[in-house]
Amino acid sequence: MIYVICYDWASTSGNHTGMRYLYEYIQKSNPELYKMYTFNMGRRFLDKGKRGKQISVFFTALKLAMTYKSGDKFILTEYLHRDSYQILFAKIIRFICPKAPIYAMVHLVPEKLERRYSKAQIKKSSRFVTEIVTLGSSLTCYLNNLGIENVYT
């Protein structure tokens, strides 16, 4: 099973521009292979506050780690987006299932990444995932220049 962890952002909810739409399409085309977990980033999720969001992500990761089977994979669609807590998710999966393949999509521009994380934090976060996937070669080059080698466009 490939577990896709994505977010339904208010700005792209219900239209074809968001990651959720993309992965829903992929899941519908192959439901026996893909299982999607969506965090709704609308008012209810935002009202939970930082701790509430972390708890939601923690228990989802714990549930998936406890049901992990050899051959399962994880795709994180908003890695390094501070509000998604996907670094926490990856840490939990990596701790409980050290051999689980975790693929993380990063699609924020370097300026936004640097506003949220130090370069050392960005580099450290790469250790929790198997591979980082970007949507452009300039972001791949930026991450490579930080010393992160497991990045692919």
Predicted regions and their residues:
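A short, glycine/small-residue-rich beta-strand->loop->alpha-helix junction that serves as a flexible
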Residues: 5-21, 81-83
